[in-house]
């Protein structure tokens, strides 16, 4: 007969009327019993013949999470001008005195951040914007382009102008300044207009990427043409003192970007940009492509690899840099839905490209992308605004895989020890936290996003029957992209974007100037940054407990009034460092802090309400006696694992699920196992703060017997059959807890000390977790353990009782990093009377 839930509870000693623990508990370690129970609960039966279930409630397989929904009315969020102060270390030192080595090291890591992977795969521009929403392709294209444009305007992206130069907006950092003979050259325009950048004599690098003109002149003279364009390009550049035009006409092939169908990086797009000539040909030369492509009349990239002189000549005489969008103006409408109708709506469509306020030299950057982008809802509660998702997953997979640095995250017990107190709390919202941390420009070639321009994007999506030959763009191809769909979409978008439609229909390549979210390095850097800042804040304001996890910063103080005054001072301090806070999103929590998915109060820690609701929903939807795909089990275990520390039996209760995931088999919930888990998760117990104290109870065991020292009493017992040593030690610890009720137990076994009971026989692990819940362990070397003799059957010999102090752990967070001493000649900082008479120390 299958095991009933009541019987199972009794077996696990979860009921009060169980027999003496010393007899009952060792039985749970018996392998035979564990096997029988597993068979009864159908836990071991992994090879099932009925089809697997692939969806349970909201949980689907690990990689097929809910499909994002496109919202045609998404608004692009605005980004403040974020500029983290470069001398952040000095500013902190003026405020707090000398920083510790740890803080300095962390702050130097992000000033600037560096990312140089050994290998980078370059993808064609077509893959720049992911076709996530096929039915809203055009709308998604423009919204994404607008988002990228907003980021560029906010100084978060560089725009690739030529192979070796980029432009950006916002305040420059010193590593972006003029290094004339080094690798970087930087120059600021006097006026920020779009067309005003031609005649400056000082500059090294003009904002107009006229490399192509000069290069084409050299190329054509080799093809036997008159170097007619040369005079144009040289016109204004005579005055500029240091032109280093590194053009080697003989060694380099002409520039050209491969048709984007192929995914290889084109090594010929090499140093076109290094002709750094000032030029006056900017207005005529719409080199809207910030790459070294030339546009032919149809707007498709023309390759200039091996072109016979005649065609090169016709190319040079015609409108070289013609623009796909503006060409519709002169062509006959092909139908009612021809784009000509839209292009004729406006007389002035604005420039083909915009240029940043500053220019900078960069390492050779191909006209390619290294990751794709798409839009999703900003968060589950805010679906009106969009968020850009950047997929640089190439750096986490395959041959281009980078191993990211690891960083410490406080575990639940450390977090509770730190934050469970009677303080009042508030949390600060750092707006666009990732975009605070600057990236070195030399990392730009590895983090490229962009798009191939509207015609290519549309052509790629609709490339069903028509095979568009990109190499030879001709006039007839111009109308190939006209369609009712595109026409209607563009008309609607015209209301939103107006003449920007023209700008956004051009190709563009952007590199990150601040760290993007889609790279594994970013969370590490953000964690280093905020933890260093909080460490400084804790020292500057000794009455304040500041703590952070990623971009979530919380402040705690003894009274609400004090918290408010601290809030003002700390906000001003953070603003002076260039950290942008969002004052509307500051949350005041009172005495129970919501942080990292937990509610933390003076009573301890529990999961937040929305997680409790998810648990209830999960158990409501959980099918019984149906094999569930192990990928779905991963999702279920993810949720249950988060709340496991708050249940009686903890993680050991989930071991059968873990085992099936590990063996990649389906899992079938029997009614009893489901009822057991359900009951476990419906009553959650808080994880309490550990208290420091003196250890007076000790446990020890040998494979055959156990011994306890409780104060001056000694006890011993034997096991019916010899047990593995770790199991014996765990049993001894359980006996010590149940006999003495002590919350502090000394043991010499590292596995018991770690409080991870998942490797023990399943039933024993579950029961021991419940018995030892809330117990803290202290390590006692075997030689000093007073329970060592009784465990070997010797009761007469007394070892002196140790005075072993226990200090609760706060993980790797050192709350009080003492500042290095200040040299004596500095005057003392003024100390105003504090609202508290004593500096608050952690509980």
Curated annotation (Swiss-Prot):
UniProt KW keywords: DNA replication, DNA-binding, DNA-directed DNA polymerase, Endonuclease, Host-virus interaction, Hydrolase, Inhibition of host innate immune response by virus, Inhibition of host RLR pathway by virus, Magnesium, Metal-binding, Multifunctional enzyme, Nuclease, Nucleotidyltransferase, RNA-directed DNA polymerase, Transferase, Viral immunoevasion
Sequence ranges of Polar residues compositional bias: 288-299
Activity control summary: Activated by host HSP70 and HSP40 in vitro to be able to bind the epsilon loop of the pgRNA. Because deletion of the RNase H region renders the protein partly chaperone-independent, the chaperones may be needed indirectly to relieve occlusion of the RNA-binding site by this domain. Inhibited by several reverse-transcriptase inhibitors: Lamivudine, Adefovir and Entecavir.
Pfam families: DNA_pol_viral_C, DNA_pol_viral_N, RVT_1
Gene Ontology biological-process entries: DNA replication; symbiont-mediated suppression of host innate immune response
Region feature Disordered, mapped onto this chain: 224-273, 288-316
Reaction catalyzed: DNA(n) + a 2'-deoxyribonucleoside 5'-triphosphate = DNA(n+1) + diphosphate; Endonucleolytic cleavage to 5'-phosphomonoester
Source species, domain of life: Viruses
Residues that, per the record, bind Mg(2+): 429, 551-552
Chain residue ranges for the region called Polymerase/reverse transcriptase domain (RT): 347-690
GO molecular function, one term: RNA-DNA hybrid ribonuclease activity
The EC number(s) this enzyme carries: 2.7.7.7, 2.7.7.49, 3.1.26.4
Region Terminal protein domain (TP), annotated ranges: 1-177
UniProt site (Priming of reverse-transcription by covalently linking the first nucleotide of the (-)DNA): 63
Domain Reverse transcriptase, first and last residues per copy: 357-600
Spacer: region residues: 178-346
Protein's UniProt keywords contain Hydrolase: yes
Membrane spanning residue stretches: none
Entry remark concerning the domains of this protein: Terminal protein domain (TP) is hepadnavirus-specific. Spacer domain is highly variable and separates the TP and RT domains. Polymerase/reverse-transcriptase domain (RT) and ribonuclease H domain (RH) are similar to retrovirus reverse transcriptase/RNase H. The polymerase/reverse transcriptase (RT) and ribonuclease H (RH) domains are structured in five subdomains: finger, palm, thumb, connection and RNase H. Within the palm subdomain, the 'primer grip' region is thought to be involved in the positioning of the primer terminus for accommodating the incoming nucleotide. The RH domain stabilizes the association of RT with primer-template.
Function: Multifunctional enzyme that converts the viral RNA genome into dsDNA in viral cytoplasmic capsids. This enzyme displays a DNA polymerase activity that can copy either DNA or RNA templates, and a ribonuclease H (RNase H) activity that cleaves the RNA strand of RNA-DNA heteroduplexes in a partially processive 3'- to 5'-endonucleasic mode. Neo-synthesized pregenomic RNA (pgRNA) are encapsidated together with the P protein, and reverse-transcribed inside the nucleocapsid.
Other comments on record: Hepadnaviral virions contain probably just one P protein molecule per particle.
Family: Belongs to the hepadnaviridae P protein family.
Protein name: Protein P
